């Protein structure tokens, strides 16, 4: 049985990352990708996981993500970046969370990795971000930097983290 959540992902030239991200969410009911006209194999890879791929010229992180959210069709949306992964433990926890009606959104900790090493200090852990929310209660705050989801309702916290693989090399 598929997890009844829509995944919303934005991409631009993410062929190095996107397959691992999509593989980690392949058992979600819906995956929506909004691509900013990638010039690599990103879209080709995405086609192996979803047919819900939309093109939108780059307009900033918040605008791209809001467009992706608007294309989803399920009551719950999870925004995932191309360099992030959802673990089995996180899938189990969020499946349980959405089965009750206590909250309209959830902050999820991010476990950030730099050059393959987990960054535990300097404010990089637990790095809570609001990524899971009821579509009818949340939207992106449109601003230049540090975009975030705004939820009109109660928000809770999840214990299991998203794995975030930032820079794998100094060239990245």
Q: Where would I find each of the regions flagged by the language model?
A:
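Conserved beta-strand segments of alpha/beta enzyme cores
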Residues: 30, 52, 154-156
